[in-house]
């Protein structure tokens, strides 16, 4: 449901407008993207190539539209686009389908001058607590991931 004109993207724009509207000095400093699991496993009839092409096309359109709408409210001339991988435990169970989507995410973010953050070795909630939730990172892994995102943000801002 992510895509220009689709419900989740409309919600993203609504929330962005709301946040920016709270104070005229509010600025967008980065675009953090951490989605794609559903795109990896839904539409079983899609080949890996179709999954890749569809996801890349949707992300490129979304990121481009977002930049066009909000470039005047960005903190810097170039808005850092940062994305991350999936939980290892979930990824291993869905590797074939996920590789196409992850490749699309990586290439799209990098084409916008952004960075892709690796998530290998980070534990899921299930691995930490045994609760069956293998798609979300546990609290400790989220802290590590946040630090990795910030390092990517700093590197982009420095032009590396």
Describe the role of every protein-language-model region.
Residues 1-160:
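Cell-envelope and extracellular/periplasmic
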């Amino acid at each position: 449901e992510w895509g220009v004109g689709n419900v989740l993207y409309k919600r993203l724009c609504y929330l962005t407008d709301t946040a920016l509207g709270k104070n005229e000095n509010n600025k967008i400093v980065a675009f953090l993207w951490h989605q794609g699991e559903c795109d990896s496993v839904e539409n079983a009839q899609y080949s890996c190539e179709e999954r890749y092409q569809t996801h890349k096309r949707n992300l490129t359109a979304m990121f481009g539209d977002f930049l066009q709408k909000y470039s005047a409210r960005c903190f810097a001339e170039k808005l850092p686009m940062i994305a991350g991988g999936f939980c290892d435990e979930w990824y291993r169970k869905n590797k074939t389908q996920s590789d196409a989507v992850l490749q699309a995410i990586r290439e799209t973010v990098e084409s916008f001058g952004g960075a892709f953050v690796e998530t290998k070795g980070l534990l899921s909630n299930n691995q930490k607590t045994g609760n069956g939730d293998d798609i979300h990172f546990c609290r400790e892994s989220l802290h590590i991931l946040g630090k990795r995102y910030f390092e990517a943000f700093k590197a982009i801002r420095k032009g590396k």
